[in-house]
Design a protein with these regions (language model features):
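Conserved HGGG/HGGXW glycine-rich cap/lid loop of the alpha/beta-hydrolase fold
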Residues: 2-60
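Active-site loop/oxyanion-hole signature of alpha/beta-hydrolase fold enzymes
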Residues: 44-88, 97, 101, 261
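Flexible "cap/lid" loop of the alpha/beta hydrolase fold
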Residues: 96, 100, 112-145
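Conserved alpha/beta-hydrolase catalytic His-Asp/Glu region
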Residues: 129-131, 148-206
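Short beta-strand/loop motif that positions the catalytic acidic residue
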Residues: 209, 214-217
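Acidic catalytic loop of the alpha/beta-hydrolase fold
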Residues: 219-224
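Short alpha-helix in the alpha/beta-hydrolase fold that links the catalytic acid
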Residues: 225-232
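Catalytic histidine-centered segment of alpha/beta-hydrolase-like enzymes
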Residues: 244-260
Length: 274
C-alpha cells in the first residue's frame, strides 16, 4: 500500500491531515487539494488496498475496519499522534472506523492518537435507494460489458453535465489511464459491496463525540442525494454542514477552489489554523 507525505510549506510543527479517497481509492484524487492544504498541514495521502492492477485479490472479509487499521498502522509508523481526516464518500467511512480505533487505543495505551477533526464529503449514514440503484447499474455494466464500459460511464455519476461537455478531452485521457491500471474486477465488486453494506452506528457516534465534524454535500450530486449529508450529520449528532449548489459528486475536482475555501473556513473557525 503506497502512501505519500507532502510536508507543510510554512510550518514544520504543523499538524497532519490524512486524505482518503472514495471508491477509486487513489491518492491522486486529491491533487487539487494537496497543494492548498500544504500551506497549513503536513498532508498524508495514500492508495487504498485493492485499487491497482497488480494488487492481489481482496479477501471476502474486506471491510472498512480493515482499511482503517491500515491507516492506523501508517500513523504508527510515522509516529503521528494528532491529525485531521478528510474522506470523500467511502473515504469518510474509513475515517469513522479510524476514530473507533483511536478510541480503543485511548482506553488501553498511555500514548494515543487523537483525531482532531473529520470532514465527510458527499458521504452517507446508510445507503440510499437511489445510490443503491446507481451501484446496481455499475455492477451490471462491469459484469456484462467489462471494464471499459464501467470506466466510460463513471463520469455520468461523478461530474455535472456542463463540466463533462467542457472537459471531455481531459476526462477521456483520465479514463484511458485508468483502463491501463484497472484493478481486478473481483476487487472492484468487493469494494462496492463493502460500501453498500456500511452503516453508521452508535459506536461511531460515541467515538466522534469530541471530534470536530464537518459535512460537505452537493445539491447536484447524482450519486448520493443531498439529504444523506443531512442524515449523516443527524446520525453523528453534531458538526458543521456546508451545502454547495454545484459540483456534483466529485466536487473536489469540479469545484476545487470552492472546496478548498470551505475547508479553510472550517479549520479557521475551530482555530486549527490562523
Amino acid at each position: 500500500m503506497n502512501y505519500f507525505i507532502d510536508h507543510c510549506t510554512n510550518d514544520s510543527a504543523a499538524d497532519f491531515i490524512v486524505l482518503a479517497s472514495g471508491l477509486g481509492g487513489h491518492a491522486n484524487f486529491w491533487k487539487l487539494q494537496i497543494k492548498f492544504l500544504q500551506q497549513y498541514f503536513h498532508v498524508l495521502s495514500y492508495d487504498q488496498e485493492g485499487c491497482h492492477a497488480s494488487d492481489s485479490l481482496l479477501d471476502e472479509q474486506y471491510s472498512f475496519q480493515h482499511l482503517a487499521q491500515q491507516v492506523f498502522n501508517i500513523l504508527d509508523q510515522e509516529q503521528i499522534t494528532k491529525f485531521h481526516f478528510i474522506g470523500h464518500a467511502i473515504g469518510a467511512f474509513i475515517g469513522t472506523e479510524l476514530a473507533l480505533l483511536c478510541e480503543q487505543e485511548l482506553q488501553s495505551q498511555p500514548q494515543f492518537k487523537q483525531m482532531l477533526s473529520l470532514t465527510s464529503i458527499n458521504a452517507w449514514d446508510e445507503l440510499d435507494p437511489h445510490t443503491a440503484k446507481c451501484f446496481e447499474a455499475r455492477i451490471h455494466l462491469l459484469k456484462s460489458a467489462g471494464a471499459e464500459a464501467y470506466v466510460r460511464a463513471q463520469a455520468l455519476f461523478l461530474y455535472p453535465p456542463a463540466w463533462i461537455s467542457q472537459f471531455i478531452n481531459e476526462i477521456t485521457q483520465a479514463e484511458n489511464q485508468q483502463l491501463l491500471a484497472f484493478p481486478p474486477i473481483h476487487n472492484v465488486l468487493t469494494r462496492i459491496k463493502t460500501a453498500v453494506d456500511f452503516e453508521i452506528n452508535h459506536l461511531h457516534r460515541e467515538a466522534l463525540e469530541y471530534v470536530a465534524l464537518h459535512f460537505i454535500g452537493n445539491e447536484d450530486d447524482f450519486l448520493v442525494p443531498i439529504q444523506k449529508t443531512r442524515d449523516l450529520q443527524q446520525s453523528l449528532g453534531h458538526g458543521t454542514m456546508n451545502i454547495l449548489s454545484h459540483g456534483a459528486h466529485a466536487s473536489t475536482v469540479t469545484q476545487s477552489d470552492l472546496i478548498n475555501r470551505t475547508l479553510f473556513e472550517f479549520y479557521k473557525s475551530h482555530n486549527f489554523i490562523e
